[in-house]
A protein has these predicted regions:
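ATP-binding N-terminal substructure of ATP-dependent carboxylate-amine bond-forming enzymes
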Residues: 1-86, 274
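Phosphate-binding site of ATP-dependent enzymes
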Residues: 141-237
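Short amphipathic alpha-helix with an adjacent loop that forms part of the alpha/beta core around
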Residues: 47-54, 78, 123-128, 152-155
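A short beta-strand motif that forms the metal-chelation/ATP-contact edge
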Residues: 55-60, 135, 175-177, 184, ...
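Short amphipathic alpha-helical segments and helix-helix/interface helices
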Residues: 27-31, 73-78, 103, 123-124, ...
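Flexible loop residues that form catalytic
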Residues: 13, 63, 121, 137, ...
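C-terminal active-site "lid" helix and adjoining low-complexity regulatory extension at the edge
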Residues: 230-279
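A conserved helix-loop-beta module that forms one wall/lid of the active-site cleft
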Residues: 74-147
Length: 279
């Protein structure tokens, strides 16, 4: 008799409205392929905590901004950690999964990140700029983002927001990794249309930059996306390290790279199930 196949609860908000893209198409593709190797069911993020006990692992994919279901996500996270539920990506991520504090920490440590502070007494640490970006610490997808002048900052920097100089970057670029292996890079040639991505061939220095943050985060398993911008001096600055539910923009890849990613994803899931003990 054949061994039972691993049971995967795949978490996705198929109806999430995203500007310029359809998140659901990506998860329809991935689940259709993963079913060849796993017994798989999809669920909405609000239902994950109630359903996860019947599965060998939970895979969190395009589940939308946690801000929209904070209580349910916190309950899922607390229960999964308490029970030892296998969650992919593992819940030990130090970047977006844990909030935006890492941007403050990395900035204070002098790493190549857009300079970031959250309090009025630290505004002197920001470089001079014509405009500044203010966004909620718990925000996502540019929700609540404001562009303001320096004179407005003291009244806004109260610890609940992040403050950064507005960088006139040449373009944004994203580097996708599965576990610690680089998969592909995409960039938006037109900063005004940042959701329109095309393949990007990274240099050795680009990959060294991206891998520095992957190594810092320390996740042995999972999908991570390093988002950066090309600063006026030609260097890269980290915008965010998405380690919770990064959108992958697979539709922007050619068939060979897309197939390579699907293969790497499935192999990573098998390693995860083999390496991480079940509860």
């Amino acid at each position: 008799m054949a061994d039972a196949r691993p049971r995967i609860l795949y978490v996705s908000d198929l109806a999430y409205p995203a500007r310029g893209r359809r998140y659901c198409d990506e998860d329809i593709l991935l689940t259709s392929r993963l079913r060849a190797e796993f017994d798989l069911a999809l669920c909405h993020p609000r239902d994950a905590a109630a359903l996860m006990d019947a599965f060998d692992a939970v895979v969190v994919r395009n589940s939308g901004p946690v801000l929209g279901y904070r209580a349910e996500y916190d309950a899922f996270r607390e229960r999964a950690l308490r029970q030892g539920t296998r969650v992919y990506n593992p819940l030990t991520g130090r970047a977006d999964m844990a909030g935006k504090q890492y941007l403050l920490d990395l900035s204070a440590a002098g790493l190549p990140v857009i300079p970031t502070v959250d309090r009025a007494e630290d505004l002197h640490r920001l470089p001079g700029a014509d405009r500044y970006v203010v966004k909620p610490r718990l925000g996502a997808d540019s929700i609540g983002l404001r562009i303001v002048t320096r004179a407005e900052l003291p009244a806004l920097a109260d610890g609940t927001v992040l403050v950064q100089p507005h960088v006139d970057f040449a373009y944004e670029v994203s580097f996708c990794f599965v576990d610690d292996a680089f998969q592909y890079a995409l960039y938006a040639p037109d900063p005004a249309r940042r959701w329109e991505l095309v393949p990007y061939e990274p240099t050795v220095r680009d990959l060294e930059f991206a891998r520095r943050f992957i190594d810092w985060n320390g996740l042995r398993h999972g999908i991570q996306r390093v988002d950066a911008c090309r600063a006026p001096d030609g260097g890269l600055l980290l915008v965010e390290l998405e380690d919770l539910n990064p959108y992958l923009s697979l539709d922007a890849l050619d068939e060979d790279r897309r197939e390579a990613f699907v293969t790497a994803f499935a192999a990573s899931l098998h390693r995860f199930l083999d390496d991480v003990p079940s509860r």
